[in-house]
């Protein structure tokens, strides 16, 4: 039973991402109960102790404890951060074989508890593992969400804000597709306030166009740069996960770029991929189909084809 009748989030995987996510939840007052599950039980116990010692500084009361899969029964949201990490030189897709086996065990254990909530997947390759979570869980696809390109979009908005000297909150631009090497920027629908970005740089010549391309490359390759410097990325994605969690638990109907299931939109079917979607307490209310130009359409189809190729290999063995 729930301790206080409030919103319960179960976090599976108390590594860098999982612990940073719990820290973000706690500091933003998003959840009422947070349960930590990790294969290394000692780590989960230690983290729960550490977080509880900081409860006096939190903006609202929160119950935090280390638990097991039985705690998923009454959870509103299970967030999966567990799995093998990306090493220097590895792509996110290199992690498929290692992590699908881990996910089958995790998801089946969660469902055996009687879980009836939503899944949020953070582990890479996130689009593939969100699809795997959906398959293994048997839940409707709208109740299984991946972090998708939420962090890529945040990086994009940050770098564009720096370039144009405006707050990133006033940059309206999206990265869609695979959370990985085939992702793409939607320049045709990118705005600073109400001004199209392409129009803003028109008069600045070819060098400004090259600047925009460099910004995208820095977005796409950011994880590689961070991993090379400090071994892993976790703060940015933790804050992105907290944002999705708030949209779910507070029933916000917020539009966020998550990994969502496509069943005809964007001309694609049977794939989870990063697209803008409306998120509320029921999960993905709807996917928003952006009007893409021909080049963007081709790049998006290439990204989807890359993911489908990996899925075909992973699920036919």
Swiss-Prot record:
The keyword Electron transport does not apply. The modification Phosphotyrosine is found at residue 224. PROSITE patterns: L_LDH. It catalyses: (S)-lactate + NAD(+) = pyruvate + NADH + H(+). Substrate binds at residues 86, 92, 124-127, 152-155, 233. Signal peptide: none annotated. This is L-lactate dehydrogenase. It comes from Geobacillus stearothermophilus (Bacillus stearothermophilus). The lineage of its organism: Bacteria, Bacillati, Bacillota, Bacilli, Bacillales.
